[in-house]
Amino acid sequence: MLKNFFPNKILSLNKNLFTVLIVIMISVIIVGLINALITSPPDAVQGNSVRIMYVHVPSSFIAIGCFGFIGIASIATLIFKIKILPLMAKSMAPVGSVFCLVSIVTGSLWGKPTWGIFWVWDARLTSMLILLIFYLAYIA
């Protein structure tokens, strides 16, 4: 039955497509970072520190999204007994933890000029710290 899907052709197509998509992704990231961090004008109130938000907010969204994926994959594993879902969830944890750490660091860098201190025990900051602890516990 596997011969019906022509795995050699599909794998060669994926290899070529993967290379093209990597080149497109890297070029889009470079153009986006240049536009966000260099050509973006300073904010009237926050000045140049607003540029940190172009990295901080997406990394927070990705960290929370990865955690949501881990939760959904883990629940689906318990219900449907699909054997690849725990592997996908386990491989998503380091990615989410890196983005969570980037979110905490960039949030602290933004907080220093804005609030005058690197860390405030705000609910959002504390929840990202707890999320990082959850990630590290899940990885361990």
Go through the PLM ranges and name each one.
Residues 2-9, 15-41, 47-48, 53-115, ...:
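Hydrophobic cores of alpha-helical transmembrane segments in multi-pass integral membrane proteins
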